[in-house]
Amino acid sequence: MNKLLELKNVSLTYQTLNDEIKAIENLSFNCNDGEFLSIIGPSGCGKTTVLSLIAGLLTPSSGKILIDGKSVGSNIALGYMLQKDQLFPWRTIEKNIYLPLEIKGINTKENKEYALYLLEKYKLIDFRKSYPDQLSGGMRQRVALIRTLVFKPKILLLDEPFSALDAQTRLSVCDDVYKIIKAEEKTAILVTHDISEAISMSDKIVVLTNRPAQVKSIYRPILKGDSPIRKRESKDFGLFFEKIWKELV
């Protein structure tokens, strides 16, 4: 598989009035095309900061971040899915999904048809004229994912996208999001505090240290099952959980 994302000795230092704070130090890892990679680590270690660097929202103090061999910011399409769905309450589901197309100036008939195709494919077409407050939390997150997919990004950046959901809904939506991402053959980078979530969804897991964040270890969980819920039933699931738990305590 081709390396789609590469971080090479990336460091980030914040300047304050009285001090210099190292947030990230010599961080290196890669993600292949089509992989689902999770970033996990202690609270406050800089996981979301890493996503911001990949997205080009922050500039590293040193090191390189390459997407498809090009520097971040080279007009490479990235999709960002946040903790909250960020759906506009005054717009219908259909109009919410068209929003990225409008912002990017690519609101063409072809792209709008693709948006409706995604709604149809993932069984949300009957809700296209509904408003966000008429949908459950899980359905809203599915809509948010489709909105992220509609402009065909190379990489999806997922920042704790399930954290606002209750436990039962979280498992179900996690399963749905995983299946959609795999069906669309997308590369995904997930930031999560949930070890089980990382193990069940990921082809690769990057474990970070406390700040300044460095790569502590990398895991490739190979589990039986075609979905996160099924993978949680694998006999090796507990072994990976114990190993990663020990890395974090």
Across the structure, where does each feature detected by a protein language model lie?
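Helix-to-loop junction immediately C-terminal to a conserved catalytic motif
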Residues: A55
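Conserved ABC ATPase "signature" region
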Residues: E102, K109-F127, K179
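Short helical segment in ABC ATPase nucleotide-binding domains corresponding to the A-loop/adjacent helical element
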Residues: E94-E102, K112, R220
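The feature captures the beta-strand-to-loop junction immediately N-terminal to the Walker
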Residues: I40-P42
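Conserved ABC ATPase signature
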Residues: Y131-L135, M139
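Conserved ABC transporter NBD signature motif
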Residues: G63-S74
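A short, proline-enriched helix->beta-strand linker immediately N-terminal to the Walker B motif
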Residues: V150-K154
